[in-house]
């Protein structure tokens, strides 16, 4: 009975913390206008990152929890993010966003974002079709996306890319506007 009580308490505390983080993100995402395309970058969560208020042995922050956090921008702001189960569910992509949508994907890594911003470094990335024949949604991101959500819990070094202009920040994320080059 004690183990069950401890598990219920841990789960409740974890939900409380995730709810606080997601509420923080929802408030900051108000900078994203309706119809905008949102690219998500997620740095690996440090192994020592734990849920606040929960013993470390019971509550590690799980990266999977944040993979689809951008779906809140779809709900709240009528924005687009590229891997929202399209094709496998009744969710359809508008013709405008078909070229930057994937049925199954995960956020970009910081390395992919940095390399793909530079045409020379982008050549070293694998940007061929996936198992269902879709190209990576993030290719040519500076030309196709309007905003970048960078999730890193404040622990990852961020590259200085001229394409990114910070517009909002939270305790574990930053939102950037994509600045398109004039060339």
Provide a role label for each language-model segment.
Residues 7-11, 130, 158:
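Generic, low-specificity signal for short hydrophobic/alpha-helical stretches with a mild N-terminal bias
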Residues 1-4, 70, 165-168:
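Generic secretory/membrane-interface signal
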Residues 18-21, 28-124, 131, 141-153:
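Short periplasmic/luminal acceptor-recognition loop of GT-C membrane glycosyltransferases, typified by
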Residues 24-28, 159-162:
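A short acidic, amphipathic alpha-helical/loop segment
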Residues 149-183:
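Solvent-exposed soluble domains appended to multi-pass membrane proteins
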Residues 1-17, 40:
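Transmembrane alpha-helical segments
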């Amino acid at each position: 009975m004690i183990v069950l009580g401890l598990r219920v308490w841990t789960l409740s505390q974890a939900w409380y913390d995730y709810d606080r983080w997601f509420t923080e993100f929802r408030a900051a995402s108000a900078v994203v206008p309706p119809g905008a395309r949102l690219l998500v970058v997620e740095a690996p969560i440090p192994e020592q990152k734990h849920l606040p208020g929960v013993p470390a042995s019971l509550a590690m922050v799980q990266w999977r929890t944040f993979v689809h956090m951008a779906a809140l921008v779809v709900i709240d702001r009528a924005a687009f993010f590229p891997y929202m189960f399209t094709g496998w569910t009744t969710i359809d992509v508008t013709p405008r966003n078909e070229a930057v949508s994937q049925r199954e994907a995960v956020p970009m890594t910081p390395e992919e974002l940095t390399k793909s911003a530079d045409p020379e470094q982008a050549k070293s990335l694998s940007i061929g079709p996936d198992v269902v024949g879709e190209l990576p949604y993030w290719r040519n991101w500076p030309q196709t996306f309007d905003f970048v959500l960078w999730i890193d819990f404040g622990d990852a070094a961020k590259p200085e890319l001229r394409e990114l202009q910070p517009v909002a920040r939270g305790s574990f994320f930053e939102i950037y506007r994509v600045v398109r080059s004039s060339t």
